[in-house]
From Swiss-Prot:
This is Glycerol kinase. Pfam families: FGGY_C, FGGY_N. It catalyses: glycerol + ATP = sn-glycerol 3-phosphate + ADP + H(+). The gene is glpK. One of its GO terms (cellular component) is cytosol. The lineage of its organism: Bacteria, Pseudomonadati, Pseudomonadota, Betaproteobacteria, Burkholderiales. One of its GO terms (molecular function) is glycerol kinase activity. Keywords: ATP-binding, Glycerol metabolism, Kinase, Nucleotide-binding, Transferase. Glycerol binds at R84, E85, Y136, D245, Q246. ADP binds at T14, R18, T267, G314, N419. One of its GO terms (biological process) is glycerol-3-phosphate metabolic process.
Amino acid sequence: MTANEFILALDQGTTSSRAIVFDRAGTVRGMGQREFRQHYPRPGWVEHDAGEIWQSQLEVAREALRNAGASAADLAALGITNQRETTLIWERATGRPLARAIVWQDRRTAAMCEKLLHDGHGRMLQERTGLVVDAYFSGTKLAWLLDHVPGARKMAERGELAFGTMDTWLVWQLTGGAVHSTDPSNASRTMLFDLHAQDWSDDILALLNIPRGILPRIAPSSARIGETLPEWLGGSIPIAGVAGDQQAATFGQACFTPGMAKNTYGTGCFMLMNVGDAPVASRHNLLSTVGWSLPAGNATHATYMVEGGVFMAGAAVQWLRDGLGIIQRSADIEALAASVADTDDVFMVPAFAGLGAPHWDPYARGTLVGMTRGTTRAHIARATLESIALQSAELLSCMNADSGIPLSELRVDGSAARNDLLMQMQADLLGVPVVRPRVPESTALGAAGLAGLAVGFWSSLDEFGAQWQAERTFEPAWPADVREARMQRWRQAVELSKGWSRPAAGHA
């Protein structure tokens, strides 16, 4: 084994920490994975223990190296990809979190977002950040932590506090507190980042009463930003690539030219389309975001995306398993759903944590409609599976309209992309081929690619992208009229779910 033969990618997700060792062909050589606990202290609240995440991430990194038969000396670089928006504050001197991290799914700041909109800040925030004002993003979560964690605001004003999303937290831990940084893909999900200036917005920080000093510096997505302490993985490894999970997956799917798009089917479901070197203002409440930034001479060059996010995709299947007991394992849903020819007009709207793009209704709730005495668990399973494809099709229609670029195919990844029935549903509802890659680990591969480019492991985007290959293509089978009728029925079901948990007047 020769030195610098591999790249290690850390993939810090919503429900588990993973690590994967890749070779130059983009082949997985070793892997590790650990789930960690989800905390639900109140309805609508979701939290993670950042210390547990760090320990689980360190364990799986060591496991991946063991499984690859590799050591730190065999690694050219380390890349990081992460669940986005999840918000943490910690003490600079000790690295001790002041509270559990507030997860992207958490809705506790919905009322704060409503006040921002009521006070007339919505348009400015959307124009500056590319985001819709929503509790999903980090900005209001950080403001909440500063106002509700005892002593946090005074510590922040004294310069004793650090804020970060999960990438920043892992870099801090890996470098022993030497590096406090993020990349533009993660920064652009905070609602604190000016897409056009490519920097934190002082106006937004003032609006939310957030001291600039607690924010990390912003480094390119592909750049050497520090080195791991030798005690963590047996040697110093350059940390050279960082991107939020959905942007990393888009990079790993080699969506390098405008009009290329991917959908990742995980806990949530996220579709991103490359729109080139300038942000696109959405007319359909989609998000405009940074895909990645690469060094270009003495400057950096950002690639922009439009994104639609579904809060509940695989999580809806988990609810069938854990909440209703309809299936014993998530993988069982495909056979159960395939045991009936259709849903018999049953629709599931999995708005358990509100609705994301293009509706953005934090008060929507999960809805199951169209049931009769003839409805079986198979119909409910099929409706749940179809809801994932329906939400994605709705988003793609908006993306096409915003970008003016028709899609010729959709590249897919994530755990649920292994479900052949779901992928065929997706092709039928989109009317374009759905393509699953040979290497399913697109998110981790994207982080590896960004790190590898920074250290010369791959010489160019073209060299990295050349390894992408299709494993299977799902061709659409439905005519346009059938497709549109199904989408229209879905829109009816979505309307029924909206506003369900909105507080009554005087009871907020």
